């Protein structure tokens, strides 16, 4: 089969074309199929960039939805949701890509080139992984880069955007290629397509890009984490960057409203609330210790000690049960009402409460476990029901 002409390689802004069907194959699993064309504006998945999506319209007006696109041995296959009788070799198919989808990928891919090139020139970092995800672009470097370094690179990358320099596509000869310094993640056979962004990057790439860097709009690094000796970046460009900044501003406004603080003062307000919370937590811990000591003092040595205390968190339950088991060798339990029913912690000095815990979970729809001397969990029953169950089991 003849290879498919790739219109998108020469004009990434071309949205429509009319091609002829080379082959059409049904897919019995999905009820759809795949169609190969002699020329296409649809970009196939590859090089970290998702495939285009859109429609194919046959001569009789039948519209086929293209959900995915793949390349095999130079032939580009368009996955469609249905394969009507008119989809036969030689038939015309009018192509239309989802332009909003494509332009987003052009912004992300061009932005990735700019930032990767800047990171390479500033720090010698190699891009060893790249994927345009639904929310952000993932970029992996082979060396660690500091937060200060990433900030400097982000600023430099955006300066390239502000310069609105052309994104040049060339197809050098083997001789020209041998004299050219460019980035490439793998050995490439056949004609090499070089994407050059003056002042930023020279890279072998088959993807779609904006004609000028200004169309990228903005590059924003959202997150960075250490990954396999390098750093993994979460990056957004263009419309995604605008949406990310708008979302950040909305969250900041919400926090500011809650804390009665201006946008420029939210960090200080959060620190203040955190300090207050830490102080209250320390006070709460001390008051709980006093309460647990008082409850333990009420326990009769050798007798059971089951206490219901509202408002305890898992740590508080564990502390109370442990404290009770220090005061008596009987069965001890700390219970507190929660959204599921009851949080519990069962303990017994020198005993094994695992079988009892298992029985409680089975009887009261609970979950939990632990060590012989202490078990913890929750169940779908009121604290009073749990207390009654424990007392009956211990008779």
Label the model's feature ranges.
Residues 1-395:
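A glycine- and charged-residue-rich anion-binding loop/surface
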């Amino acid at each position: 089969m003849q290879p498919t002409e790739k219109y998108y390689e020469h004009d990434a802004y071309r949205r429509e074309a009319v091609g002829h069907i080379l082959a059409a194959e049904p897919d019995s699993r999905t009820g759809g199929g795949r169609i190969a064309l002699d020329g296409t504006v649809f970009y196939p998945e590859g090089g970290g960039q998702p495939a285009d999506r859109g429609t194919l319209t046959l001569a009789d007006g039948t519209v086929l939805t293209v959900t995915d696109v793949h390349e095999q041995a130079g032939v580009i296959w368009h996955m469609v949701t249905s394969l009507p009788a008119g989809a036969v070799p030689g038939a015309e198919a009018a192509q239309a890509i989802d332009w909003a989808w494509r332009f987003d990928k052009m912004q992300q891919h061009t932005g990735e080139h700019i930032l990767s090139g800047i990171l390479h020139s500033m720090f010698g970092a190699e891009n060893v992984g790249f994927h345009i995800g639904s929310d952000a672009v993932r970029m992996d470097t082979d060396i660690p880069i500091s937060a200060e370094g990433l900030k400097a690179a982000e600023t430099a990358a955006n300066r390239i955007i502000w310069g609105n320099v052309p994104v040049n596509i060339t197809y050098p000869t083997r001789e020209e290629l041998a004299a050219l310094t460019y980035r490439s993640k793998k050995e490439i056979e056949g004609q090499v397509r070089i994407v050059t962004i003056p002042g930023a990057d020279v890279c072998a790439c088959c993807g779609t890009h904006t004609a000028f860097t200004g169309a990228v709009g903005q590059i924003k690094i959202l997150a960075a984490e250490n990954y396999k000796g390098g750093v993994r970046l979460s990056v957004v460009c263009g419309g995604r960057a605008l949406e990310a900044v708008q979302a950040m501003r909305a969250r900041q406004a919400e926090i500011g409203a809650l804390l009665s603080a201006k946008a420029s003062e939210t960090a200080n307000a959060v620190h203040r609330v955190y300090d207050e919370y830490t102080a209250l937590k320390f006070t709460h811990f001390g008051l709980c210790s006093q309460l647990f000591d008082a409850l333990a003092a009420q326990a009769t040595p050798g007798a059971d000690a089951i206490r219901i205390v509202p408002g305890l968190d898992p740590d508080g339950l564990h502390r109370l049960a442990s404290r009770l088991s220090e005061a008596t060798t009987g069965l001890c339990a700390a219970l507190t009402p929660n959204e599921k029913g009851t949080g519990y912690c069962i303990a017994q000095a020198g005993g094994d409460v695992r079988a009892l815990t298992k029985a409680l979970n089975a009887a009261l729809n609970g979950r939990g476990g632990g060590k012989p001397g202490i078990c913890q969990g929750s169940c779908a029953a009121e604290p009073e029901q749990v207390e009654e169950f424990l007392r009956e089991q211990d008779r």
